[in-house]
Amino acid sequence: MPGFLVRILPLLLVLLLLGPTRGLRNATQRMFEIDYSRDSFLKDGQPFRYISGSIHYSRVPRFYWKDRLLKMKMAGLNAIQTYVPWNFHEPWPGQYQFSEDHDVEYFLRLAHELGLLVILRPGPYICAEWEMGGLPAWLLEKESILLRSSDPDYLAAVDKWLGVLLPKMKPLLYQNGGPVITVQVENEYGSYFACDFDYLRFLQKRFRHHLGDDVVLFTTDGAHKTFLKCGALQGLYTTVDFGTGSNITDAFLSQRKCEPKGPLINSEFYTGWLDHWGQPHSTIKTEAVASSLYDILARGASVNLYMFIGGTNFAYWNGANSPYAAQPTSYDYDAPLSEAGDLTEKYFALRNIIQKFEKVPEGPIPPSTPKFAYGKVTLEKLKTVGAALDILCPSGPIKSLYPLTFIQVKQHYGFVLYRTTLPQDCSNPAPLSSPLNGVHDRAYVAVDGIPQGVLERNNVITLNITGKAGATLDLLVENMGRVNYGAYINDFKGLVSNLTLSSNILTDWTIFPLDTEDAVRSHLGGWGHRDSGHHDEAWAHNSSNYTLPAFYMGNFSIPSGIPDLPQDTFIQFPGWTKGQVWINGFNLGRYWPARGPQLTLFVPQHILMTSAPNTITVLELEWAPCSSDDPELCAVTFVDRPVIGSSVTYDHPSKPVEKRLMPPPPQKNKDSWLDHV
């Protein structure tokens, strides 16, 4: 017996030492799961519900990520929700961008450092009023591809992308020490016509393969059986979305038909609504949002406020809806934090509601950032687009008997110039037509350097032009943003069908894909010899409605050595019509004061300089207020308040657009700019 004790004591000692260690490891193991017996989430074994807000890192400069996240935390949110736009990270097949403003991993780690959990929505389709719903345009190189389906070509591209993205996300899962508690599969799939369950099952398998079996995967659809019929899938937790205009009881009953047990979740509770060019700015009354949020939280539900901050559609990233209506540069969304990240009345009202249910962090709330009105900056005309083709298209044009689309000439965004000659004399006006509505989306038309007018998708498909036989016919075609929602997201751009002149098909095209980004960035010091402007002068005798599309440039200096400068600002375009604007080579986005409702564009301070003059480059497409008679009118103005809700005036009636079954009703009586607290 003593010998036996001698042999077993070391073993008992080892077990005693290992036992507590193993128990401690189990107690501290991070877990996030669904407790179906208590209709709740469990976070590390304890009942939990999230109060989240949407922020899209792709719409907020990295410079401001921490500021916005801190404000969200101080509002009482314990989580954030964000989309991952595929096209933001893979602009060309196999070419990936994950640095600077594209560094989604840093963004998620920053949220984690600030104590915020994350609801991740990696698509591959996201909607989000984002260009093509986040799907990369290069998918359309196969013209017959059926997006968001089990089409083999689509699945192959998706599989490759998920194989890049999801392994980056796995270390950031809550179970692995990160902030990500749930991951959405696809997005509102029940609103899409395909209803392809093989596609959803494929995604489910790939998400599980890359992320493991422990993470909570979910879907989101409108709170109606019509949407849930094709959007829900066994093995993915079903959630719904709805706004202030919905009956909350009925909405959650819709979820309960798919998920009899488990937490109630509104994945998109709308704090505001989206805008379209040529339609009034959408707002939702603060009282309505606060009241509905109270009712949702009183039911013990988890909720995500969409949006908590909307941000900006910089460059060409805005989407569009059908019938075709493009979204503007501002994605303010009438959210609790303004486009510029400023605190609003709605922010404090919702914070007050949240603190009735959860503890709100103590301490000061980061203030709204200061804004500065830098004033008027005079611009000078550089060159018309036609005169700058050597800069804009250095590789030369493409010849084709019939027009080619943007995709066919390897151009995804921006502009393409289509050129041919008039096959007949048009001394008397002759109809230039797109009989199949094939101008996607706007074409700025000129004959021998004399502007003729604009062809516009759905609105203007015929334009009378004049010119002699053999004259040069130019159409500068703009991609205004691909459709992001519904059945028509395979949105080809350019001249997607033939044009006719007096019913005769035009042929023998010379096509110039324009690299405006490289041209602007590499010519900030100027564009060499400048135009004499004689084309504009000649046109002035015929009409005051249009000038040739042209680039304009100006500079302004910000004093150095002053601690508070530079500051955020807003750029306004008095007298200008429609175009694109860059500051120091940074593409701010589209302006269109002639159509509205947005009149100013947000200019974040980090793109401004005090060490050197700041360069403004404007591409005006329709009419510029510039003439030799009064050069002071050729100017833009920097102001310290945004104007995103002007009265709407436009030259062609727009049809009403409805994104979802029952969008929140816009409130018409709000001030045109958000209050700053």
Swiss-Prot record:
GO terms for biological process: carbohydrate metabolic process; galactose catabolic process; ganglioside catabolic process; glycoprotein catabolic process; glycosphingolipid catabolic process; heparan sulfate proteoglycan catabolic process; keratan sulfate proteoglycan catabolic process; response to cortisone. Changing residue 514 to P: In GM1G1; decrease in galactosidase activity. Changing residue 59 to C: In GM1G1; loss of galactosidase activity; severe mutation. The active site is at 188 (proton donor), 268 (nucleophile). Changing residue 482 to H: In MPS4B and GM1G1; severe decrease in galactosidase activity. Detected in placenta (at protein level). Detected in fibroblasts and testis. Changing residue 83 to C: In MPS4B; decrease in galactosidase activity. Changing residue 434 to L: In GM1-gangliosidosis; unclassified clinical type. It catalyses: Hydrolysis of terminal non-reducing beta-D-galactose residues in beta-D-galactosides. Residues 24-28 form a propeptide. Residues 1-23 form the signal peptide. Disulfide bonds join 195-230, 626-634. Changing residue 494 to S: In MPS4B; loss of galactosidase activity. Changing residue 184 to R: In GM1G1; loss of galactosidase activity. Residues 652-661, 668-677 have a biased composition (Basic and acidic residues). GO terms for molecular function: beta-galactosidase activity; galactoside binding; protein homodimerization activity. Changing residue 134 to R: In GM1G2; uncertain significance. Changing residue 149 to F: In MPS4B; 2.0% of wild-type galactosidase activity. It comes from the Eukaryota. Belongs to the glycosyl hydrolase 35 family. This is Beta-galactosidase. It comes from Homo sapiens.
